[in-house]
Amino acid sequence: MRNFRLDDESGHQEALFSWAAYRTEIMPELQYMYHVPNGGKRDKATAAVLKRQGVKAGVPDIMLPAARAGYHGLYIELKAGENTTTKKQKEWLEYTAVCYGWQPAAQLIEQYLLHSDELTKEQETVTMR
């Protein structure tokens, strides 16, 4: 895996998807993991078009559509450093894991895909640092 700038969320996200590409042989479901590009700065016209097309504020960054342990997929909100969740993101948190950095996200994904039968309710709802 190459070195990534880990001073912001985009670097952590690139590192996570690089890790996922490397681990796909062990966890084939990783090939279906994707980023939801809701964030970022956009002009008003583009933002209005995207909103009409279904873009919603607060939707988690990463989706892994693999059913496990009674869940229909894993949503991850990826944070870096001291960044915190927004008000809109908090509305989604009942259905989302918040991971501070790519390594905790990778750890959660492995736990979810390989050992979901061992997940406890606390692990399912915990914010990982």
Language model regions located:
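Catalytic phosphate/metal-binding cores of nucleic-acid and nucleotide-processing enzymes, i.e., regions
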Residues: 1-129
